[in-house]
Amino acid sequence: VMHPDGTREYCSLKDCDYHDIAIFLKNIKTVCEESCVCCMEEIHAIFGSSAKSTFSFGETFGVLQGLLIALEIPYHLVPPKTWQKEIWINQDKVVKNSGGKKGTDNKATSINAARRLFPTEDFRRNGKCKSVDDNKCDATLICEYGRRKCL
């Protein structure tokens, strides 16, 4: 969550269950009142993923949409390429070689962009983690996209 003053709060499904997320969203809506808007990444099945992981991914997406609808929080679905085009700059990009093909390493590129835009932010999931959480970076960048587009 990015508040109007730019401060951020995080709630991860790795640390919380759906009930915790519902309480988190309800509290955010109470604090933000009418200015509360959510931006979520528009997801699709990932080629090569197992049926189980695709189902789990879709279930989580559906539950989050359901919570937003139930709490009457307006939301926007943003395709990954849309927010990435707005947020990433050439200096952020990391190229990877996979099977002889070059392509953008989306996780590393988002981490670079998040560090550039929010240099004082700790992007670890919690204080015990040693590495940066790319999901937290993506969530922050999607919020920043929404802020820039006045969504």
Predicted regions mapped to residue ranges:
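Phosphate- and other anionic-substrate recognition elements at nucleic-acid/protein interfaces
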Residues: V1-L151
